[in-house]
């Protein structure tokens, strides 16, 4: 009838096109491909199309419990999934976030080997967000619109609230990536709302989990910490499913220069506080002193960034590796606070608001590998983490280097790693004669001899674990480098081949892609790895992916690091040279003072 609506249902018993024979399954990132299907719906009047809609969906099966644990354990298609995620609030503070930018944000989560995004308080609301999570294999912990009870009141209008919840579920439930619905951040909803939500879930979403509280129930826990902690401290947390844990995460020097005026670069003041570097949950007021005590006196902003990239890497790697060590016993998930920054910030991010990743992204990428080798920084065990659905036979190699770069100990291990488990290869037998600060390099090769995981640590002797100041005295290593560019339709790939022909370790080698024509950074851009360390006589290749239109001609790769220099190199369409601005000695010594108002 005119001015009316009607619900039309299609039943697979009577609609043959709803049957999918031998479906290709949708998997979260790392566990398999993200196979998606399209359902075409149309409404016709007298044989002519009046309206149509294409609906994307994936075929997968979720379950939320296992026989050997009471903790929330998510399985997809019968395979237990260790949740490695990031929290999102607003995707962008002003909600100015076109699909192209959003895709870069979500793709960087995929590159970091994450498999979940928590849509904190439901603040990401676009169809693009869900479509891209489907595409890149990011499970969505989705939430309704109730903040922590301390941060916001209960809904005033019950009927309007429930209508909004119903609309949200109906609008987005076709997306393969949504794995559960959560009612409230860090608190329970009022009983009337909780009861109504449970009824609504039974009606509209009987196969997805309803979680009433993001911080309680079946091993789920929130409440941080949110400030920088030493790596070994991250091994002490025993919560099974951690929905919030974070750290200071300082961006690159260029990102800092871009987010505040030059007058504020060399003084930690209120402008820094405006970008979240202040007292409070992030611990920004105590961070500079901690950095100096751990790594040595901070000379200026460039030195602060240099030391902070080391701190970023240590904290974010340990945040995930500490959970790896307890894989499914009891740990079933970790979601860092936060992975995506809504505004330019010094904290809680794995890339900056301008989309340049800092060392935190590559630390997470390392720790969140499906097959991973690690040094337990609490017990001293070498551990192999196997997230695969099949057992692993492999060979591991351990090498220890003194601060001067000399190799002082090596050992090989035969590895038999069970599926979905952490396997200890034993405590390292630390040799005599170690320097006060030394390095540990780990490698894991599969049965065919292919390298599947490697890891690198800087470490101090017991009793002085937090004194790494000797690193500040490392001699400069000049790396040999070659670059090559490959252009294909829509993409350019730049391969950077680095070789350490010296006798010292080259620590935290960092690449940054720029346009040659104007020396501006190319953002976003995707690195196969970054902030890498090379022992003497080691070679590594990093591949950079960019769009030819973003390069607008020739490319320029800049190199910096903890103690890294580089010989200039070039080939067709690309040049490589030292990032002079990132060098500590390029800038005056200021000590980076902190004003009283910012403490």
Which role fits each region the language model picked out?
Residues 82-85, 116-119, 139-142, 179-183, ...:
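Structural recognition of the beta-strand scaffold that forms the well-ordered cores
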Residues 181, 233-399, 408-410:
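Substrate-binding clefts and catalytic carboxylate motifs of secreted carbohydrate-active enzymes
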Residues 149-155, 182-183, 411-412, 426:
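Short beta-alpha connecting loops at secondary-structure transitions
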Residues 65, 90-91, 124-126, 148-150, ...:
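Flexible loop/turn segments at secondary-structure boundaries
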Residues 42-44, 128, 132-136, 171, ...:
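Alpha-helical structural signal in soluble globular domains
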Residues 51, 166-270:
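Active-site region of glycoside hydrolase catalytic domains
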Residues 1-116, 327, 331, 356, ...:
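Secreted/periplasmic carbohydrate-active enzymes, especially glycoside hydrolases
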């Amino acid at each position: 009838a005119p001015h009316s609506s009607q619900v039309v249902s299609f039943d697979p018993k009577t609609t043959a096109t709803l049957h999918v024979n031998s479906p290709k399954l949708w998997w979260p990132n790392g566990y398999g491909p993200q196979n998606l299907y399209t359902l075409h719906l149309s409404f016709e009047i007298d044989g002519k199309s009046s309206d149509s809609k294409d609906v994307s969906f994936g075929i997968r099966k979720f379950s939320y419990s296992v026989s050997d644990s009471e903790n929330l354990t998510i399985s997809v298609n019968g395979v237990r999934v260790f949740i490695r995620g990031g929290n999102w609030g607003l995707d962008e503070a002003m909600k100015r976030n076109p699909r192209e930018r959003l895709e870069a944000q979500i793709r960087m989560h995929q590159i970091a080997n994450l498999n979940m995004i928590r849509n904190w308080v439901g603040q990401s609301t676009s169809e693009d967000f869900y479509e891209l999570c489907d595409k890149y294999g990011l499970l969505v912990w989705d939430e309704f619109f109730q903040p922590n009870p301390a941060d916001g009141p209960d809904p005033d209008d019950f009927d309007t609230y429930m209508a909004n919840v119903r609309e949200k579920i109906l609008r987005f439930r076709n997306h393969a990536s949504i794995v559960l619905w959560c009612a409230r951040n860090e608190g329970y909803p009022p009983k009337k709302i909780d009861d109504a939500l449970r009824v609504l879930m039974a009606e509209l979403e009987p196969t997805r989990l309803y979680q009433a509280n993001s911080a309680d129930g079946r091993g789920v826990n929130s409440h941080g910490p949110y400030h920088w902690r030493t790596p070994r401290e991250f091994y002490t947390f025993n919560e099974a499913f951690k929905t919030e844990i974070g750290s200071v995460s300082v961006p690159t020097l260029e990102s800092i220069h871009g987010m505040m005026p030059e007058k504020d670069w060399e003084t930690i003041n209120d402008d820094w506080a405006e970008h979240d570097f202040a007292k409070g949950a992030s611990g920004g007021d105590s961070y500079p002193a901690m950095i100096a005590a751990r790594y040595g006196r901070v000379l200026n902003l460039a030195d602060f960034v240099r030391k902070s990239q080391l701190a970023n890497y240590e904290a974010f790697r340990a945040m995930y590796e500490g959970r790896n060590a307890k894989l499914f016993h009891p740990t079933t998930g970790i979601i860092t606070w936060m992975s995506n920054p809504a505004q330019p910030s010094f904290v809680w991010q794995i890339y900056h608001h301008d989309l340049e990743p800092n060392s935190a992204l590559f630390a997470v990428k390392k720790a969140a590998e499906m097959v991973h080798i690690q040094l337990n920084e609490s017990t001293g065990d070498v551990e192999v983490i196997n997230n695969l659905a099949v057992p692993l036979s492999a060979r591991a190699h351990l090498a220890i280097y003194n601060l001067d770069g000399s190799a002082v100990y090596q050992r090989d291990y035969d590895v038999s790693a069970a599926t979905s488990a952490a396997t200890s290869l034993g405590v390292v037998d630390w040799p005599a004669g170690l320097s006060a600060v030394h390095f540990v390099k780990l490698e894991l090769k599969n049965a065919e001899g292919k390298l599947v995981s490697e890891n690198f640590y800087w470490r101090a002797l017991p009793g002085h674990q937090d004194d790494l100041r000797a690193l500040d005295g490392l001699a400069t290593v000049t790396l040999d480098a070659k670059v090559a560019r490959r252009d294909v339709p829509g993409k350019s790939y730049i391969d950077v081949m680095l070789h350490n022909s010296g006798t010292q370790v080259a620590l935290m080698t960092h690449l940054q892609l720029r346009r040659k024509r104007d020396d501006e950074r190319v953002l976003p851009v995707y690195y196969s790895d970054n902030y890498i360390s090379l022992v003497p006589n080691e070679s590594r290749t990093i591949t950079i992916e960019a769009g030819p239109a973003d390069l607008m001609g020739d490319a320029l790769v800049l190199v910096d690091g903890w103690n890294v220099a580089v010989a200039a190199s070039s080939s067709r369409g690309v040049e490589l040279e030292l990032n002079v601005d990132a060098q500590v000695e390029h800038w005056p010594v200021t000590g980076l003072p902190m004003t009283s108002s910012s403490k």
